[in-house]
Regions:
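C-terminal membrane-cytosol helix-exit motif in multi-pass small-molecule transporters
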Residues: 3-29, 212-217
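Structural signature of the two symmetry-related core transmembrane helices
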Residues: 109-124
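Hydrophobic/aromatic end-of-helix segments at the C-terminal termini of transmembrane alpha-helices
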Residues: 57-69, 97, 152, 156, ...
Length: 221
């Protein structure tokens, strides 16, 4: 885990240094892009950080979910292998209804409610001793996380201050950075404590995501 984390650090730093040299996508936007290249709106930055947190939480399931079930909850290898499949299946189905939910209730309520649901799911993962209930909890977590990232991309693209392509690429860059950095960090902490305690990082990430959702609500007004 630590070696993977150390290997990802130079990539992240290099990407940050080279980001300002990227060419604008459209020639007609060159002048506007030059003026706003270093002025990413706060709403886009908040969306990017929240996407990082959401992707990191999702990544923790793929990287550590099966190992957590088999080593901490003492599930069989076959049952442990079900974790990510169930989580991904629930996420897929939930994202199919994400757009209707956004149209019905609005983008911010979907993000806030999704954060609460995913937090409840992660609490269940850490609390229940029953393997079946842990699987259900992972499903609840996936249900909550599913609509968050697509909604964040949509909100960033509609920021109105920088081109949609620049906004969504910023969100994507930060989001995939979360997949690179956070799951290995959980492994590093698990080496120094245990996997159960290390996964409390995910609970903290979701709590932070909820707090930022409240900030995003103020910025969106």
């Amino acid at each position: 885990g630590l070696k993977f984390f150390l290997a990802s650090v130079p990539f992240v730093l290099l990407s940050l240094l080279l980001n300002k040299y990227l060419l604008p996508e459209r020639r007609v936007d060159e002048e506007k892009t030059a003026k706003t290249r270093h002025k990413i709106p706060l709403v886009v930055l908040v969306c990017a950080v929240m996407a990082l947190l959401a992707y990191a939480a999702e990544g923790s399931v793929g990287e550590w979910g099966a190992l957590y079930l088999t080593t901490v909850k003492e599930a069989s290898l076959g049952v442990g292998a079900l974790v990510y499949g169930i989580f991904s299946g629930v996420t897929f189905v939930a994202r199919l209804v994400g757009d209707p939910l956004r149209k019905e209730f609005g983008e911010i309520p979907v993000i806030i409610f999704g954060s609460v649901i995913s937090f409840i799911g992660m609490v269940g993962v850490l609390s229940f001793s029953s393997v079946a209930l842990v699987l259900v909890s992972y499903s609840v977590m996936g249900l909550g996380l599913a609509p968050i990232v697509p909604t964040l991309f949509s909100m960033a693209g509609k920021n109105g201050k920088i081109p949609a392509a620049a906004a969504t690429s910023t969100v994507a860059f930060m989001a995939y950075g979360g997949l690179l950095v956070v799951p290995p960090s959980i492994g590093w902490m698990a080496q120094h404590t245990n996997l159960h305690e290390a996964l409390f990082i995910v609970l903290g990430l979701i709590a932070l995501m909820f707090s930022l959702a409240l900030l995003l609500r103020k910025l969106h007004k």
